[in-house]
Regions:
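Repeated scaffold domains used in trafficking and secretory/extracellular systems
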Residues: 72-85, 119-146, 192-219, 246-267, ...
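Structural motif
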Residues: 96-102, 161-178, 228-235, 267-281, ...
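Short loop/turn segments that connect beta-strands within beta-propeller blades
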Residues: 106-108, 180-183, 237-241, 281-286, ...
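A structural motif specific to WD40 beta-propellers
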Residues: 110-113, 185-190, 244-245, 336-339, ...
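C-terminal closing repeat unit and adjoining cap/tail of repeat-based domains
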Residues: 324-329, 355-357, 365-376, 393-461
Length: 461
């Protein structure tokens, strides 16, 4: 296929499935069904849509996969995940027999394996459960996890299992676990696991909705978290299928992350992080904090977890009790302080990490853990808008977007976190930033306003 510049061409690629096969969504699961299209090539040709990308990436070198079956509006997170250790990209696709997960090498695009087709639990809307009556479809999604030295792919969906016209079904998150090193086609999962939940509505994209259902590995193995009417947290052993529902520790707070030493919780009143019976976040407070700090003050508020590191916020002496501009990073297992920085107005809690774990960020605050150095990217005297970090490479190049408000082009920036002052550099208009930065390649997601999602995996120069 001739190479074309992104724009109207994107719609054509998503409609034709160029770069890999795409089947209509299975009947009754968000589509009208239909016959299978041609099989995806084991090694795809280069990108047919040339995106505007940061200068470190080659727009015409790499591969792409279109997910034309996806609706324009959906409540789940995008059905794409990466294996940072294995250098792989996993995504959910469809056949006439059900949903499949497919895994490719990021560097070559070669297909490692395709799962057998699967019909997920009945969605909440179809089951008539809860109060959800919106127009956003709830779709299966995919995550990756690392346990006992091995990486796994987890195909998952939220919905109602069982039930009939008389009896209520059981609300669950169903997990299908595949070893990342599997190979072949129609691969069966090594384990199927049902996690009982009480969300009463659809899961939300990137945790932005009221139910905030997440299936992620925060550095201690796979975990399922949900809010809704009853908040819950479950750690999952993907090899045995056993689950830890945070019963004892969560009597004192909300479960945030399971570590090798126990559960980190945030207490119900002030959201302060602690591991009950082991440590409290204020045991190793960052320098520059408020002299009036105690366990009844909002010092050490939980923000997020990534790669075994906790991010928390604190008061400062200058700010008093009215703001928490001090941001700290702690070891999630021990609570020990690793780095901190004072920013003007830190914002955002979606944490990201470089594949090697040296660099992490949450919203407008980023850290080089090797240098124990922080960078503030919030708006201030010299910056008109917040910079929200989306991804970080192993060499410390962070990519982010300007928080410009609804309906406006966010603008793209890059930041060097490895040295210097970490000042953002504005990229040309229309530049897309990678959703994930893998060694040697960036993964870009481009939604179509009508329907479909284009995955572009582009090589670094």
């Amino acid at each position: 296929m001739p190479k074309v510049v992104a724009g109207a061409a994107l719609a054509g690629v998503l409609l034709t499935g160029c770069g890999g096969a795409d089947d209509p969504a299975p009947t009754g699961k968000g589509g009208e069904g239909g016959k299978k299209t041609s099989a995806a090539p084991p090694t795809p040709s280069g990108p047919s849509v040339l995106l505007t990308v940061p200068p470190a990436y080659s727009a015409d070198k790499g591969w792409e996969q279109s997910l034309a079956w996806m609706p324009a509006k959906y409540s789940s997170k995008p059905p794409v995940a990466v294996g940072a250790r294995s250098g792989t990209v996993a995504y959910v696709n469809t056949t006439e027999d059900g949903y499949v997960v497919q895994v490719r090498d990021a560097s070559s695009g070669r297909i490692r394996f395709t799962s057998e087709p699967w019909e997920p639990p009945t969605s909440m809307a179809e089951a008539g459960n809860g109060t959800y009556d919106g127009d956003e479809a709830e779709l299966p999604s995919v995550s990756t996890a690392f346990q006992d030295g091995r990486e796994y792919v987890v195909l998952w969906a939220h919905g109602v299992q069982g039930g009939d016209a008389l009896a209520k079904g059981k609300e669950v998150v169903r997990l299908l676990v595949f070893p990342m090193d599997a190979s072949g086609s129609a691969v069966a999962p090594k384990r199927r696991i049902d996690i009982p939940v009480e969300v009463y509505g659809p899961n939300s994209e990137k945790g932005k909705g009221q139910d905030d259902l997440r299936v992620e590995d925060y550095g201690g193995g796979l975990q399922v978290h949900w809010n809704g009417l009853k908040k819950g947290a479950v750690a999952v052993d993907v090899t045995s299928g056993t689950i830890d529902a945070c019963a004892d520790a969560c009597a004192e707070g909300r479960g945030q992350v399971k570590t090798s030493k126990g559960w980190v919780v945030s207490n119900y009143v002030l959201d302060l992080a602690e591991m009950p019976g082991s440590w409290h976040i204020q045991d190793d407070a960052p320098p520059g904090g408020w002299s009036m700090m105690d366990k009844s003050s909002m010092d050490g508020q939980y923000v997020s977890t990534i790669g075994g590191h906790l991010l928390t916020r604190w008061h400062t002496e200058a700010g008093g009790n009215f703001s928490t501009p001090l941001v700290a990073v702690h070891d999630a297992a021990t609570g020990k302080l690793e780095a901190s920085i004072v920013c003007e107005r830190p914002r955002g809690d979606d944490a990201v990490s470089s594949p090697n774990g040296r660099f992490i960020a949450a919203g407008t605050v980023a850290f080089d853990l090797q240098r124990r150095h922080g960078t503030c990217l919030d708006a201030g005297e010299s910056r008109k808008a917040d910079v929200l970090v989306r991804s970080i490479t192993d060499d410390g190049t962070a990519y982010g977007e300007l928080a410009t408000g609804p309906g406006k082009d966010p603008g793209a920036v890059e930041i060097d976190l490895s040295a210097g002052d970490g000042a953002p550099r504005l990229l040309p208009d229309g530049t897309r930033v990678p959703e994930w930065a893998l060694p040697g390649a960036g993964v870009f997601l481009t939604p179509n306003p009508v329907n479909g999602l284009l995955i572009s995996v582009l090589k670094q120069k």
